[in-house]
Amino acid sequence: MKVLVVGGGGREHAIIRKLKESPRRPALYAAPGNGGIASDAVCVPIAATDVAGVVSFAVQEGIDYVVVAPDDPLVLGMVDALAEKGIPAFGPNKAAAILEGSKVFSKNLMKKYGIPTAAYETFADAGEAAAYVRANRKYPLVVKADGLALGKGVLICEDEAAALAAVKSIMEDRQFGASGSRIVIEEFLTGPEVSVLSFTDGKTVVPMVSSMDHKRALDGDRGLNTGGMGTIAPNPYYTPQIAQVCMETIFKPTVAAMNAEGRPFKGCLYFGLMLTPDGPKVIEYNLSLIHI
């Protein structure tokens, strides 16, 4: 059996290490991999976002299964492209990947189906967004780029000047490129933050161990958000009682909502949660095995 893991970071190395322990003893490949992965798998010089290149290699090499670990190739439709060639892959298809690929979509989905999240507004015009900020009197305020931004597209703004600067940076200066064509401006939630990865086949949701993700760049919960500075698990605030509430009010309803929208989600679904005084609320969804 031949298995290809798409990606080139520590997460992909961890996945390959576990696959290496399989009694099936698969031949392992990574695209593009890295120097460390090269000791455990054959690395091929194909970028994780090169959908055509990955598919071509998988066909030529006779790959039996592909694990698409990063979010970018999922949003680009790599799972769909592999399926067209009859190659099964782990991860959501392009239609489902919009759950992370567009924060506007995910926020509207939660609102439509009653999944608890922060109050918000969406904007496609920088002037309208700036006017909304000037009318706001409650800070901090959170400004989010609509599309993928390597975990850096969420800006917590302490005052009007910072919020206006965030709108300008994202929508006018295009700090995150096309991902900033639209933004979400939402209320700032308080409480312990919880990260929960889960496996789903589009019907059943099986959560993994909870974790606490440290996103800020500096000590003392200061600095800009990053893709992640570290994680501890399990999360001490995520009790069995809270886990049950999240399952019934967030996890199951999210999967059901995606089915209702004709976008069944299959793969790994990450729930970024805040345990607010009003109960657990969704901060964000992610597609990938980000805390492996």
Please provide the spans of the model-predicted regions.
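Internal nucleotide-binding/catalytic subdomain
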Residues: 154-289
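ATP-binding N-terminal substructure of ATP-dependent carboxylate-amine bond-forming enzymes
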Residues: 1-95
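Short acidic-hydrophobic, aromatic-tinged amphipathic segments that line or gate anion-handling sites
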Residues: 44-49, 121-124, 157
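Conserved small/polar residues in nucleotide/adenosyl-binding loops
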Residues: 66, 290-292
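Short, charged, surface-exposed secondary-structure boundary motifs
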Residues: 38-41, 55, 98-104, 218-220
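A conserved helix-loop-beta module that forms one wall/lid of the active-site cleft
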Residues: 90-153
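General beta-strand structural signal in soluble alpha/beta enzymes
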Residues: 5, 30-31, 67-68, 89-92, ...
